[in-house]
């Protein structure tokens, strides 16, 4: 992404890209309060959403967060969602220097340093920060990304330099998206009073009021009079807002996708029950002694590769923010010509430090799955029911009743979520959803290689832990046995031959078998269960009507899916959990539209219908 070109004038940051100050050079703090952060009233509601065009140095955000935390809880929302779009990246040290030169540093030190600790690299994406009672989604993209987003803001901060120097931030296309992402009575806050901005706001249904600006300036405020109606050509992928009878959630399965989801739900005040068929945690694929956090490396502009990268970096940031984990990196090796070609095309990618046939991923590293899952469940305060093998559910009076083996029944859940990994194949029977259950075996060896970070090629090697070194993993679609196979251990050892001397004697001390869940297109399957009969009837003519407005989708009660994470569940589970929470709790969707379409449970059916099949 583009990096901001800035200098200091009178200790105030000045943009060379826009030939303008980032804010009022004389009294920027008070102007920001007057125009933006103190110009609206909080609402005592579940979620309050502020959207901003132009994050800049983050001053509006920190002022808003301070105001939130200083307000009596009964007079403010329970959770603030702050979504800010920024196209010009400012380096971490530059941000700290700006606050120091402005003499704001001490006032914002605690919040600023928390922010800088998890500040991402200069790469496009949506990055979430966890603050007390607040989620910040920092969107590193051009402002045109708004057309890819889905939320309904309570307040908009239209910031971004003088309109005559940054027309795109105030033009008709932007204001249309602002209106689309607003609801009735959404307030627009802006320092500008430009006539063309007023004209664009009025065109899309805003009531515009001129008011006294900061000091002698004039500014406007605007309020959306009625929510905008627009034609949705892809309504089959659009969200349906949920209505819950209570805040009880049942999750089937106790692996990593369940653990991250339970934690995220707990931040929203849900009561969570988790049902696991085994007698303890760690019996499935999420229970290995060691594993690696890494990313696929595909060619640029490949959706699967870009999604893998975003999943990886957000998982790394999540584990660091929530569990205080530290990562030393992971080395990926190109072990064939195709992989080398991919590596060669990614040399400019800031996530991958590529040298010859090696890529060093600084944000990756070794993970300890059993401990990680256990810690997340403990933080979530979820109640885990072991030895509960799920069989079926009934949905009546807006609640689920669950039936388990041995005639065990649990009831009164407003939401049910399938997160049972490879076992999902036995419970989901959509015609077009093809699921695979793939066996994987890791091998436990006596320590043989001293490495501070994992090495990944045909197979991977983890650093030593507790006098044990894990390598793996096999890949078998045909074998469903839980018993370890000697030939799989042999294959795992053969696949790490490039890392060891041929005379090295390896001692096998154990192995573990798990099963991965895969979709036919390698994307995870996450979202609301859909009404297959409705989809087949309503969208049967998509071959001829795909460019026309579509009828809103019909979903199947409050049943949600969270599976098909393949071998990278410790990466993808974080974005999956956030997205599901957004659907369940009517929050801003934290993914761009292209990714929502890629993981939607109905995507396989829609592809077929578009072909007229």
Curated annotation (Swiss-Prot):
One of its GO terms (cellular component) is cytoplasm. Its EC number is 2.1.1.61, 1.5.-.-. Its cofactor is FAD. It catalyses: 5-aminomethyl-2-thiouridine(34) in tRNA + S-adenosyl-L-methionine = 5-methylaminomethyl-2-thiouridine(34) in tRNA + S-adenosyl-L-homocysteine + H(+). Residues 252-613 are annotated as: FAD-dependent cmnm(5)s(2)U34 oxidoreductase. GO terms for molecular function: oxidoreductase activity, acting on the CH-NH group of donors; tRNA (5-methylaminomethyl-2-thiouridylate)(34)-methyltransferase activity. Residues 1-225 are annotated as: tRNA (mnm(5)s(2)U34)-methyltransferase. It is found in: Cytoplasm. Keywords: Cytoplasm, FAD, Flavoprotein, Methyltransferase, Multifunctional enzyme, Oxidoreductase, S-adenosyl-L-methionine, Transferase, tRNA processing. Its main location: cytoplasm. In the N-terminal section; belongs to the methyltransferase superfamily. tRNA (mnm(5)s(2)U34)-methyltransferase family. Catalyzes the last two steps in the biosynthesis of 5-methylaminomethyl-2-thiouridine (mnm(5)s(2)U) at the wobble position (U34) in tRNA. Catalyzes the FAD-dependent demodification of cmnm(5)s(2)U34 to nm(5)s(2)U34, followed by the transfer of a methyl group from S-adenosyl-L-methionine to nm(5)s(2)U34, to form mnm(5)s(2)U34. This is tRNA 5-methylaminomethyl-2-thiouridine biosynthesis bifunctional protein MnmC.
């Amino acid at each position: 992404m583009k990096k901001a070109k800035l200098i200091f004038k009178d200790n105030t940051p000045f943009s060379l890209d826009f030939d303008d100050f980032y804010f009022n050079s004389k009294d920027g703090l008070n102007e920001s309060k007057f125009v933006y952060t103190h110009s609206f009233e909080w609402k005592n509601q579940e979620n309050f959403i502020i959207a901003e065009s132009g994050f800049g140095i983050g001053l509006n955000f920190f002022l808003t967060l301070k105001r939130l935390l200083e307000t009596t809880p009964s007079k403010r929302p329970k959770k603030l969602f702050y979504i800010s779009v920024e196209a010009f990246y400012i380096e971490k040290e530059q941000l700290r220097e700006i606050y120091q030169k402005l003499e704001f540093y001490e006032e914002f030190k605690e919040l600023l340093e928390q922010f800088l600790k998890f500040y991402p690299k200069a790469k496009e994406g949506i990055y979430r920060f966890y603050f007390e009672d607040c989620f910040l989604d920092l969107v590193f993209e051009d402002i045109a990304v708004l057309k890819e987003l889905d939320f309904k803001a309570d307040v908009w901060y239209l910031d971004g330099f003088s309109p005559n120097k940054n027309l795109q931030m105030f033009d008709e296309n932007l204001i249309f998206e602002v209106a689309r992402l607003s609801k009735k009575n959404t307030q627009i806050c802006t320092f500008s009073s430009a006539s063309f901005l007023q004209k664009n706001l009025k065109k899309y249904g805003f009531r515009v009021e001129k008011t006294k600006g900061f000091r002698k300036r004039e500014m406007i405020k605007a309020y959306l009079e009625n929510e905008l109606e627009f034609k949705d050509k892809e309504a089959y992928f659009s969200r349906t807002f949920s209505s819950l009878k209570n805040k009880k959630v049942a999750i089937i399965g106790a692996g990593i996708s369940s653990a991250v989801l339970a934690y995220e739900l707990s931040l929203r005040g849900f009561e969570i029950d988790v049902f696991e068929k085994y007698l303890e945690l760690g019996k499935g694929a999420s229970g290995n002694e060691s594993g690696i956090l890494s990313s696929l490396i595909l060619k640029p502009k490949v959706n699967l590769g870009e999604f893998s990268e975003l999943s990886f970096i957000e998982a790394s940031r999540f584990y660091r923010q929530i569990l205080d984990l530290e990562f030393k990196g992971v080395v990926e090796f190109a072990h064939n010509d195709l992989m080398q070609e991919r590596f060669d095309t990614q040399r400019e990618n800031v996530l991958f430090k590529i040298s010859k046939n090696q890529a060093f991923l600084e944000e990756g590293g070794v993970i300890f799955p059993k401990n990680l899952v256990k810690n997340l469940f403990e933080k979530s305060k979820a109640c885990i029911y072991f030895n509960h093998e799920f069989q079926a559910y009934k949905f009546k009076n807006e609640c689920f009743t669950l039936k388990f083996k041995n005639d065990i029944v649990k009831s009164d859940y407003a939401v049910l979520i399938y997160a049972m990994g490879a076992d999902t194949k036995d419970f989901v029977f959509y015609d077009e959803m093809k699921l695979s259950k793939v066996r994987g075996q890791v091998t436990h060896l006596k320590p043989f290689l001293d490495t501070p970070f994992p090495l990944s090629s045909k197979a991977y090697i983890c650093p030593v832990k507790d006098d044990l070194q894990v390598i793996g993993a096999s890949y078998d679609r045909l074998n469903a046995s839980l018993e370890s196979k000697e030939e799989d251990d042999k294959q795992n050892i053969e696949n790490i031959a490039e890392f060891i001397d041929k005379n090295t004697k390896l001692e096998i001390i154990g192995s573990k078998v798990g099963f991965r869940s895969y979709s036919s297109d390698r994307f995870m399957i996450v979202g609301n269960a859909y009404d297959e009969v409705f989809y087949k009837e309503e969208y049967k003519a998509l071959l001829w009507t795909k460019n026309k407005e579509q009828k809103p989708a019909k979903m199947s009660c409050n049943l949600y899916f969270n599976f098909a994470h393949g071998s990278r569940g410790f990466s993808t589970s974080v974005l999956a959990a956030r997205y599901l929470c957004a659907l369940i709790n009517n929050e801003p969707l934290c993914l761009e539209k292209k990714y929502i379409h890629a993981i939607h449970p109905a995507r396989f059916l829609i592809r077929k219908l578009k072909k007229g099949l």
